[in-house]
């Protein structure tokens, strides 16, 4: 029996009736870009991860920001009441919070009374933080952007947030900059 005969008579292990271009196409919405501004220790500039919808592996030393980025993406995807920070690192529930990421807490110092006090990169209320993720579906030829903007109202201590869902590609530099702390300018 020739190899041509084997090839012709052997049944494929998996048969997909779609054309090869459709069968190999990535299904669903895939993350294409992730941006952060003033999130954790990612401070004062826009930091971005471009992966074009490909799989991505975050690597780095302890304390390099891997869990901070994962928590940022999780913040965009999980309802606030169900959000648990730093699960990727197996940390205690109270170790990180929305406030710790907003202020950029990176260490603690003892005050005059001996109590530990968190030290952050950003002072209270004079900044805003932004998380933004773009997702694209090749099959639907559609892009969706999810974003959250965090800020403090004057005289308040609780971090406020604005949710954004837009059926197009947005970015922080173009769409979420230069409004100071005037969140009404965004709406």
Where are these regions (language model features)?
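Extreme N-terminal "head/tail" segments of very large remodeling/mechanoenzyme assemblies
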Residues: 1-187
């Amino acid at each position: 029996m020739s190899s041509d005969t084997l090839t012709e008579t052997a049944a494929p292990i998996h048969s997909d009736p779609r054309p090869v271009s459709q069968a190999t196409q990535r299904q669903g919405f895939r993350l294409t870009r992730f941006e952060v501004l003033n999130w954790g220790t990612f401070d004062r500039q826009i930091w971005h991860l471009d992966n074009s919808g490909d799989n991505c592996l975050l690597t780095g030393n302890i304390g390099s920001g891997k869990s901070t980025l994962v928590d940022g993406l999780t913040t965009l995807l999980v309802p606030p009441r169900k959000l648990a920070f730093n699960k990727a690192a197996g940390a205690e529930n109270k170790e990180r919070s929305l406030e710790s990421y907003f202020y950029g807490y990176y260490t603690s110092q003892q005050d005059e009374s001996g109590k530990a006090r968190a030290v952050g990169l950003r002072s209270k209320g004079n900044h805003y933080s932004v998380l933004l993720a773009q997702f694209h579906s090749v099959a639907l030829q559609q892009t969706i952007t999810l974003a959250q903007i965090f800020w403090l109202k004057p005289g308040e201590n609780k971090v406020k947030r604005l949710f954004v869902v837009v059926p197009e590609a947005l970015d922080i530099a173009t769409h979420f900059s230069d409004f100071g702390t005037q969140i009404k300018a965004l709406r």
